[in-house]
């Protein structure tokens, strides 16, 4: 069973009441959605996912709790559009868990894992055209270097990109992993897995994860009611920087206004940052994937 990271902290900080209207932007295997649903007997839950396998599994799990939910088969970049289509224009709480779910990592045929052999894929939405195979085999060397640096913060981006271009076509995850290993120093291989950052970078490129998240988060802030909260669990610094920047942007008073003796209400920030939470030691001991997790929480105040 997939273990949701920071589950208790996330649910307890949503400030749910019996009749809350809640959006889970990342349904996955319903770890968060199922706990939310238990706490809103008179409310409603909207859960987004573009992975049909996840939707099928989670629908059964949620149906065993109660029926006041709707699963929306869409990327959360369409958050506002899809909710508006259902005549939903404001909600009490919105949550994101940006980690790749354990089943996606563990199911070899999805091509996310550098430990298991599979065709290069990495698509969250299995209906889209762009996949990891196309990135690895069709992108220019310059574009590969760019995404490895920007999305993987990989210091050996140039040598890895050269190795990929010189060994095309590359079909499977383990082929790619071996090429990465061959193009980094031996000492680097003894640290964390040498393919980790490159696989992250390719996955982000395939799914346009950073742009999609930024657009969606602004929509979430527009949708949440006064007193409502938006929560984001991130697993790497790229996502966390975006979240931190946007939360600071909407919660900080403009420098010029700080000089005023009294700041008019309409010029004060609409949000306040509530907390930044990292996993406790016992969760880190139980779930290795929690190591890099961070939960950021913001609340609408006007």
Where are these regions (language model features)?
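S-adenosyl-L-methionine-dependent methyltransferase catalytic core, i.e., the SAM/SAH-binding region
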Residues: 1-302
């Amino acid at each position: 069973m997939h273990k949701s990271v920071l589950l208790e902290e996330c649910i307890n900080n949503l400030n749910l009441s019996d009749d809350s209207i809640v959006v889970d932007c990342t349904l996955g295997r319903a770890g968060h959605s199922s706990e939310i649903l238990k706490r809103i007997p008179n409310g409603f839950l909207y859960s987004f996912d573009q992975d049909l396998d996840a939707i099928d599994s989670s629908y059964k799990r949620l149906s065993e709790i109660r029926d006041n939910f709707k699963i929306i088969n869409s990327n959360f970049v369409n958050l506002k559009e899809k909710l508006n289509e259902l005549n939903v224009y404001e909600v009490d709480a919105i949550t994101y868990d940006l980690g790749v779910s354990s089943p996606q990592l563990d199911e070899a045929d999805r091509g996310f894992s550098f430990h298991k052999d599979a065709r290069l894929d990495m698509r969250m939405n299995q209906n889209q055209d762009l996949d990891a195979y196309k990135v690895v085999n069709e992108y220019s060397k310059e574009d590969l270097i760019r995404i490895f640096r920007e999305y993987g913060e990989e210091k050996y981006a140039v040598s890895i990109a050269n190795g990929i271009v010189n060994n095309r076509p590359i079909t499977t995850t383990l082929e790619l992993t071996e090429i990465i290993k061959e193009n980094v120093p031996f000492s680097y291989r003894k640290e964390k897995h040498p393919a980790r950052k490159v696989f992250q970078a390719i996955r982000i490129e395939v799914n346009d994860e950073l742009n999609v998240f930024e657009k969606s988060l602004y929509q979430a802030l527009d949708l949440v009611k006064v007193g409502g909260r938006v929560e984001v669990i991130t697993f790497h610094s790229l996502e966390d920087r975006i979240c931190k920047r946007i939360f600071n942007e909407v919660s900080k008073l403009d420098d010029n206004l700080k000089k005023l003796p009294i700041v008019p209400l309409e010029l004060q920030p609409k949000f306040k940052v509530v907390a930044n939470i990292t996993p406790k030691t016992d969760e880190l001991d139980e779930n290795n994937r929690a190591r890099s997790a961070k939960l950021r929480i913001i609340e609408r105040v006007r």
